[in-house]
Amino acid sequence: MVHGYKGVKFQNWARTYGCCPEMYFQPTSVEEVREVLALARQQNKRVKVVGGGHSPSDIACTDGFMIHMGKMNRVLKVDTEKKQVTVEAGILLADLHPQLDKHGLALSNLGAVSDVTAGGVIGSGTHNTGIKHGILATQVVALTLLTANGTILECSESSNAEVFQAARVHLGCLGVILTVTLQCVPQFHLQETTFPSTLKEVLDNLDSHLKKSEYFRFLWFPHSENVSVIYQDHTNKPPSSSANWFWDYAIGFYLLEFLLWISTFLPGLVGWINRFFFWLLFNGKKENCNLSHKIFTYECRFKQHVQDWAIPREKTKEALLELKAMLEANPKVVAHYPVEVRFTRGDDILLSPCFQRDSCYMNIIMYRPYGKDVPRLDYWLAYETIMKKVGGRPHWAKAHNCTRKDFEKMYPAFQRFCAIREKLDPTGMFLNAYLEKVFY
């Protein structure tokens, strides 16, 4: 019999959202997950599944039953011939990487954070960068889904294909993902090259940058023209690192956090901070080489609020210049660095922000120095207005103000997804406040 805990308080990684579920479960088997769902049906309770808890929104929150998948974290099968790995949905990617290393395999693309679960990263449409690469869910070739009534569906392009196209970005509302099969590639090393540029240069030569580097992204420092360009490409060079505790931590974290805290009293300092830290930390060329997963992932040191929308790739220049013009016209609106700009190939996953179009993701950020919230509403609203104007779609894991009406316009397949959701979960067992805004 599965045991539930009362009095557990859940908080996301950034401590920006939290909840107190009525019961908190940590199942170790499919049968135990089934027991939780049976209990929920019997007591008419809602259920939310949580993984690494990194989503900077309330997508995982509930006052009903919460299932934490951390104890269902095994590698079930490695097929070296097909280069595929099947894992339980609760495995952290950080724990999967060394297992793949043993077999000479790797995932072709990863997000910045690896303390996230296999079931969670596909659920929210996690992405990285690389115009030849899709969001992480495009690497999923099969999955198993436990539905509200206790049925297990085996899903792939050849079995329950329509559910598969929905479940690869499932928002946690179709059922409980039990296993995920990922398409891997042979293990590879990456060289990361970082160098300074300007916003004008990067936007004027965007196609050239995208052709030059397989995994190209750039960081714009608001209230300036400064840009840090980041190329990541296959290499045979031995591992090397430009990491330095003094610059990365003493300056890049401790001093920055202190100055950002001071700027909560003197907001005019933010532009100076952005320019100063670009000059201090990003004004020269740097190179790092390592195994792919050690280059793709990096440590997020700051608690933060973020927004991240995917827009049509061809709208990149227009959107960024409009955001820059808005900040120049409204000097009281301040924006922390960086605005991170990444690029992703289009796909056919029903609620993927990259559905049927190559996309540019534009991530804005406001840090919380020493846990203190910084006024961001004007910046947030101006950004959302620009994103909607250019046809943007918000990252599902990150906070946004969109409703069903917005999503019906944004997603050609939204009604198809809704029909699948209503068929798999007719009573709304897997809904919560966040998802009610999406579907109602």
From Swiss-Prot:
Residues 17-187 form the FAD-binding PCMH-type domain. One of its GO terms (molecular function) is FAD binding. The keyword Oxidoreductase applies. Its EC number is 1.1.3.8. GO terms for cellular component: endoplasmic reticulum membrane. It catalyses: L-gulono-1,4-lactone + O2 = L-ascorbate + H2O2 + H(+). Keywords: Ascorbate biosynthesis, Endoplasmic reticulum, FAD, Flavoprotein, Membrane, Microsome, Oxidoreductase, Transmembrane, Transmembrane helix. Pathway: Cofactor biosynthesis; L-ascorbate biosynthesis via UDP-alpha-D-glucuronate pathway; L-ascorbate from UDP-alpha-D-glucuronate: step 4/4. Its cofactor is FAD. The keyword Transit peptide does not apply. Pfam families: ALO, FAD_binding_4. The modification Pros-8alpha-FAD histidine is found at H54. It is found in: Microsome membrane; Endoplasmic reticulum membrane. The chain crosses the membrane at residues 253-273. GO terms for biological process: L-ascorbic acid biosynthetic process. It is a single-pass membrane protein. Oxidizes L-gulono-1,4-lactone to hydrogen peroxide and L-xylo-hexulonolactone which spontaneously isomerizes to L-ascorbate. Belongs to the oxygen-dependent FAD-linked oxidoreductase family. This is L-gulonolactone oxidase. It comes from Bos taurus (Bovine). The lineage of its organism: Eukaryota, Metazoa, Chordata, Craniata, Vertebrata.
